[in-house]
Amino acid sequence: MGEHPSPGPAVAACAEAERIEELEPEAEERLPAAPEDHWKVLFDQFDPGNTGYISTGKFRSLLESHSSKLDPHKREVLLALADSHADGQIGYQDFVSLMSNKRSNSFRQAILQGNRRLSSKALLEEKGLSLSQRLIRHVAYETLPREIDRKWYYDSYTCCPPPWFMITVTLLEVAFFLYNGVSLGQFVLQVTHPRYLKNSLVYHPQLRAQVWRYLTYIFMHAGIEHLGLNVVLQLLVGVPLEMVHGATRIGLVYVAGVVAGSLAVSVADMTAPVVGSSGGVYALVSAHLANIVMNWSGMKCQFKLLRMAVALICMSMEFGRAVWLRFHPSAYPPCPHPSFVAHLGGVAVGITLGVVVLRNYEQRLQDQSLWWIFVAMYTVFVLFAVFWNIFAYTLLDLKLPPPP
C-alpha cells in the first residue's frame, strides 16, 4: 500500500539472483544493483536487440513459466496489461512497473483496457480464506470502488507497516484524557472544570501566538461523551483507510482537517477556545462518505445506505452536542465553551483534499489537477487565517476573554 508497494512475487528472488550472477560475474566487486537494474537484466534477456521493448507474447511466456509463483489475482492483472497493448509490445518502464508493483495513470489505464482477463470471479466469491485474508478482503470492499483495485490491494497488502498513525493518535488521545480525568477528578464534561483551560494543549484565543495549540488541541476533549465518538470513528473509518492508502496520505488529510478546524474557529468564532479531534475525524469521515456517494455503483460494502445513514446520524448528534455546549452558560465566564466550527473546517477538508486522496488509490497525487487546485485553495485559506490572526483581532478591537 502507499506510494511504493513492496515488490511482487512475479519472479522468484533466488532465481533472479542466479541470473544476475551469471550475466555479471564481477558484481561482487561493485555496489549492489538497484531493483530496476535487476529488472533490466531480466528484460534484456527478452530484448536481445536492445530495442527497449519486448513482445507481449514473450511477456506472457514469462508469466506462464512462473505461474506457480504468482498470486492468482496478480497474474490476472499482469495478463490484463499484456492484452491491452494493441501494438503487441511492452516498454521497459511498463515492465518495471509490472514486476515491482509500481503503478501510474498510464499503467492503470492499460490495466482497465485489458479487461478480457478480469472477467473471472470476484474476491467475494473466493472460498477457504484465512481470517487475515477475510479481513483484508473486507477492508478492500469497504474502501475501494473498483474490482481491479480491490484485487491489487488484496494481493499486495503485507501489513508492513501496520496502520500506526491512527492507532498512535487514538492511544495518545485516550492517554491524555485519562490523565486529565484523574488530575481534575472529572471525566464527564471535563470542559466545565475551572482548571480545564489552563492546560497548555488547548487552543485559546488569547494564546493564539503559541502556534502549537492549533494542532495539540486534538489531545483535549470536552468529556468522555466527546472522546468516545471520535475514537470509534477513528478506529472504524480511519484505520481501514490507512490500511489502504497509507499513513502519509491519511495522516495528511487528518492533520489538514485539524489545522483547518482551529484556523476556522480563529476566523469565524474568535472568542472561543477549541478542543477535540473532531476536525481531523470529520475530514476522514466526510471524505469516505463522499467517495462512497461518488462511486455508489462500484462500492460493494454491505448495507451501505443504512451504514451511511448511521454515520450521518452519529456525526449530526456530535455536532449538535458541540453546538449545545458552545451556547450553554459558561462555567468560566466571560470565556465561552469550546467552539463547534472546527467540525465544519474538517468537513471542508474532507470533501476537497480528502476526496482526491481516496479517489486516487496508489496514483501520483501530483499528476491530478484537482489536487493542485485544492492544495492552492487550502494554502490561500491558511495564509488568510494567519493574516487574520495577526491583524483582525486588533483592527476589530475585539474584547477577548482573559487568558486562563
Swiss-Prot record:
InterPro entries according to UniProt: EF-hand-dom_pair, EF_hand_dom, Peptidase_S54_rhomboid_dom, Peptidase_S54_rhomboid_met, Rhomboid-like_sf, Rhomboid_IM_Serine_Proteases
Family, similarity comment: Belongs to the peptidase S54 family.
Gene label: RHBDL3
Catalytic activity, as annotated: Cleaves type-1 transmembrane domains using a catalytic dyad composed of serine and histidine that are contributed by different transmembrane domains
Protein role: May be involved in regulated intramembrane proteolysis and the subsequent release of functional polypeptides from their membrane anchors.
Gene Ontology process terms (BP): proteolysis
Keyword Iron-sulfur: no
Annotated GO MF terms: calcium ion binding; serine-type endopeptidase activity
Keywords: Hydrolase, Membrane, Protease, Repeat, Serine protease, Transmembrane, Transmembrane helix
Record's GO cellular component terms: membrane
Native species: Homo sapiens (Human)
SUPFAM superfamilies, per the entry: EF-hand, Rhomboid-like
Pfam family, one: EF-hand_7
Top-level EC class as recorded in UniProt: hydrolase
EC number: 3.4.21.105
Active site positions: 278 (nucleophile), 343
Protein name: Rhomboid-related protein 3
Membrane topology note: Multi-pass membrane protein
Domain EF-hand, residue spans: 34-69, 70-105
TM regions (residue ranges): 164-184, 218-238, 250-270, 274-294, 303-325, 338-358, 371-391
Superkingdom in the source lineage: Eukaryota
Subcellular location: Membrane
